[in-house]
Amino acid sequence: MAETESCSASGVQPTRESLLSRFGAVAGRRISGRAGVYRVETVIEKPTPTEAEQRLMVPGIRAGYYLCFFGTHVFTPTLMDLLARMLESDPHRTVTLSAALAELARQEQYLALEDTGRRYDLGARYGLLTAQLALALNGRDRNEVLTHLLELLAEREMTTGEGEPHGR
């Protein structure tokens, strides 16, 4: 979609209000005739529930849910230019992707596409491991991965924390 529309695009997923503190979120208008596609108008990093209710409501999205980033993005060179300008204007300022995306949405078409996949929080404890296991278990080498996991679990059961077999 980003290529055919010649614009930046991000995957989003309707996310319940209680999880807003984990994700950046967007608001925009649904594009007529294109299910799950929105023209982004607002971007806020980890909004509070009050801020989300005031600025991120999207018609057609269930009450108490907001369009949060899924972690997939395709950017035009404009985004890199914006980030560079933000850094140049104040080298001591913290520059965030969300701030640059908010500016991008003001300058050019920026789309959000609903993604129905499962989101994994790589910043959470064991998040990266969980994501890697999910990918491996859904891949073509699933049986080999399961075999290795079972061997690892069996080996662990056969030894104590000191590496000694049980019962000694």
Language model regions located:
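C-terminal segments
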Residues: 135
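Unchanged
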Residues: 1-132, 143-168
